[in-house]
């Protein structure tokens, strides 16, 4: 493996699956008999804001359970960033809305789909740390003071992902692009591998099983994230000592 000045890592739901993050979907893809798309869109929030808040309040409470912790894959990526400090940069672009990367110690994390432990004011656009339930007819925006303007700081269906300009800039300088625990179905993230290749990066997929865009990667390794990610990180760090 050649020396890398910049490693960009895209993470999806697969990296957090072993940490006890509930998907809140049953076998039919439903949440309390509602399609998830019906509680995760701007139109849904307009039609029934209380239902949307209930959905995200449950997800937020689940994330804050003591049983939900970073797993070995998260801690391995934090180790990679720390030990390559001074030799190169490690960026994590995550589709996940949890904070497990940060809790594991990663610093350079971009949340392209938002963050569950933050709220956003629909009146001002300001974003706030938020760890309790959002109750529309009770909670006021800490900034403007308006009632009923707070929503989860989450990118809903039909909304533009966050940090896209910054992500493109990072991809343009990336030597190695790695996708971990992603389905390859969700765009624009599923297209990052092509963007990275366009800029000359080597590409690697670490996944539980083959994803929809697996054929685009130069190499793929399959298995549980908590197993294959630490092994890969150890290999990268071992190679870096030879440089």
UniProtKB/Swiss-Prot annotation:
InterPro entries: DHS-like_NAD/FAD-binding_dom, NAD-dep_sirtuin_deacylases, Sirtuin, Sirtuin_cat_small_dom_sf, Sirtuin_class_III, Ssirtuin_cat_dom. Binds 1 zinc ion per subunit. SUPFAM superfamilies: DHS-like NAD/FAD-binding domain. NAD(+) binds at residues 12-31, 95-98, 181-183, 225. It holds the Pfam family SIR2. It is found in: Mitochondrion. One of its GO terms (biological process) is post-transcriptional regulation of gene expression. Substrate binds at residues 56, 59. GO terms for molecular function: histone deacetylase activity, NAD-dependent; NAD+ binding; protein-glutaryllysine deglutarylase activity; protein-malonyllysine demalonylase activity; protein-succinyllysine desuccinylase activity; zinc ion binding. It catalyses: N(6)-malonyl-L-lysyl-[protein] + NAD(+) + H2O = 2''-O-malonyl-ADP-D-ribose + nicotinamide + L-lysyl-[protein]; N(6)-succinyl-L-lysyl-[protein] + NAD(+) + H2O = 2''-O-succinyl-ADP-D-ribose + nicotinamide + L-lysyl-[protein]; N(6)-glutaryl-L-lysyl-[protein] + NAD(+) + H2O = 2''-O-glutaryl-ADP-D-ribose + nicotinamide + L-lysyl-[protein]. Its main location: mitochondrion. Zn(2+) binds at residues 121, 141. Keywords: Metal-binding, Mitochondrion, NAD, Transferase, Zinc. In contrast to class I sirtuins, class III sirtuins have only weak deacetylase activity. Difference in substrate specificity is probably due to a larger hydrophobic pocket with 2 residues (Tyr-56 and Arg-59) that bind to malonylated and succinylated substrates and define the specificity. Belongs to the sirtuin family. Class III subfamily. HAMAP family: Sirtuin_ClassIII. This protein may be expected to contain an N-terminal transit peptide but none has been predicted. NAD-dependent lysine demalonylase, desuccinylase and deglutarylase that specifically removes malonyl, succinyl and glutaryl groups on target proteins. Has weak NAD-dependent protein deacetylase activity; however this activity may not be physiologically relevant in vivo. This is NAD-dependent protein deacylase SIR2rp3. It comes from Leishmania major. The lineage of its organism: Eukaryota, Discoba, Euglenozoa, Kinetoplastea, Metakinetoplastina.
């Amino acid at each position: 493996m050649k020396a890398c000045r910049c490693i960009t890592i895209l993470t999806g739901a697969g990296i957090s699956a072993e940490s006890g993050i509930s998907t809140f979907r049953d076998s039919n893809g439903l949440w309390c008999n509602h399609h998830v798309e019906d509680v995760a869109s701007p139109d849904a929030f307009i039609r029934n804001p209380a239902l949307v808040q209930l959905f995200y309040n449950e997800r937020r409470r689940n994330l804050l359970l003591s049983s939900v912790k970073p797993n070995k894959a998260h801690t391995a990526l934090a180790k990679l960033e720390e030990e390559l400090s001074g030799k190169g940069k490690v960026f994590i672009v995550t589709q996940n809305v949890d904070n497990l990367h940060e809790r594991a110690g990663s610093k350079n994390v971009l949340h392209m789909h938002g963050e569950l432990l933050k709220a956003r004011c629909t009146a001002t656009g300001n974003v706030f740390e938020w760890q309790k339930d959002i109750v529309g007819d009770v909670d006021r925006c800490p900034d403007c003071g308006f009632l009923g303007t707070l929503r989860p700081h989450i990118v809903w269906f039909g909304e533009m992902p966050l940090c896209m300009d910054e992500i493109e800039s990072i991809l343009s300088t990336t030597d190695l692009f790695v996708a971990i625990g992603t389905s390859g179905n969700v765009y624009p993230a599923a297209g990052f591998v092509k963007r990275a290749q366009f800029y000359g990066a080597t590409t690697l997929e670490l996944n539980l099983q083959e994803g929809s865009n697996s054929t685009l990667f130069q190499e793929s390794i399959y298995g549980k994230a908590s197993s294959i990610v630490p092994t890969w990180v150890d290999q990268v760090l071992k190679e870096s000592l030879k440089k």
